[in-house]
Amino acid sequence: MAAAIASGLIRQKRQAREQHWDRPSASRRRSSPSKNRGLCNGNLVDIFSKVRIFGLKKRRLRRQDPQLKGIVTRLYCRQGYYLQMHPDGALDGTKDDSTNSTLFNLIPVGLRVVAIQGVKTGLYIAMNGEGYLYPSELFTPECKFKESVFENYYVIYSSMLYRQQESGRAWFLGLNKEGQVMKGNRVKKTKPAAHFLPKPLEVAMYREPSLHDVGETVPKAGVTPSKSTSASAIMNGGKPVNKCKTT
């Protein structure tokens, strides 16, 4: 009898002890999954945020990379001269094809539209409302030229901004027989003065030039200033043909 009672007491104590140990372990088992889930979620959020930030930085770097595929070239005029830009930005023709002043960046800035930039000077060729060519430190709508292949496979370059008011005839880049640049409204596309043959030296990648207003251009000393308003263009027989937007 006593043995039975003792064994019963021992059994009760053992059960009480097991229950006492089971309770904290159960609470620990219940709390640990939630903690793990919280840690997992936090880690995932941290990982995703880092990946997103890295992706944004990568996209920003890509945007800064050169995206426009153009050429470094010499422009040989059918008159027998290479177009050249002097250090002060003045333009004329030369028969010497070895000078760096005849090197130009031909940068695509639209569909069959290019910017012509002197490699040595970094200045853009521009045409103002009177048809005069001048160098521009900034890329403006006056620096845009339409590039067209003529019947004889020579290339002609016409202003994207100005043309004859009455006839609608385009104004062209051209050199006369003495190798001097001509007013755009005096150059006819059927004449050798307007015919150029690009002689590419290498393919190059360019960043898209930032488009500025024509009024922001500051011509260099000794260079014909830009007459770019609509009034001056109409007074001189020309008119703006469109308002160019940023490409």
From Swiss-Prot:
Region (Disordered): 1-38, 216-247
Predominant cellular place of this UniProt entry's protein: nucleus
CDD domains attached to this UniProt entry: beta-trefoil_FGF14
Keywords from the named record: Growth factor, Nucleus
GO cellular component: a single term: synapse
Gene3D superfamilies listed in its UniProt record: 2.80.10.50
Subcellular locations according to the entry: Nucleus
InterPro entries on file: Fibroblast_GF_fam, IL1/FGF
Biological process, per Gene Ontology: adult locomotory behavior; chemical synaptic transmission; neurogenesis; neuromuscular process; positive regulation of high voltage-gated calcium channel activity; positive regulation of sodium ion transport; regulation of postsynaptic membrane potential; regulation of synaptic plasticity
Nucleus found in the keyword field: yes
UniProt cross-references to SMART domains, sorted A to Z: FGF (SM00442)
Skewed-composition ranges (Basic and acidic residues): 15-25
GO terms for MF: growth factor activity; sodium channel regulator activity
Keyword Oxidoreductase: no
Similarity comment: Belongs to the heparin-binding growth factors family.
Function: Probably involved in nervous system development and function.
Assembly information from the UniProt record: Interacts with SCN8A.
Protein name (Swiss-Prot/TrEMBL): Fibroblast growth factor 14
Gene that produces this protein: Fgf14
